[in-house]
Amino acid sequence: MAPKRGAAVIDLSSYKLEVSDTTASRQQGLSGRDALGSFDGMLFVFGARGLYPFWMKETKFPLDIIWLDGGVVVDVATLQPPSEEKFPATHVPTHMADKVLELEAGKADELGIKNGAYVILPR
């Protein structure tokens, strides 16, 4: 089945998003992929607010992980791919969220994305 698609507007730039809203698609995430485009991302949609930890299992490139409550940023972290000999570290957000956005590493700093910022998301 083809992945669900959406878009987000951040700092007047539009990002093409793959929407991950099932347990299977959330577990897979971006694992095994070789790269992520500069204006591409993945949006993880959860059914309820929670403290959703993220890790970089089988992820080959660094990512900015942005936790959202509604469309408001509540936490941001840049995670690196694990080395071959290490188990990937898990980052637990500081606040409850209902969505998580993954973008190319460095985008959060480049766009000034920080706690309290707004992101316009697909419905």
List PLM regions with ranges:
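Compact, glycine-rich, soluble single-domain proteins
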Residues: 1-123
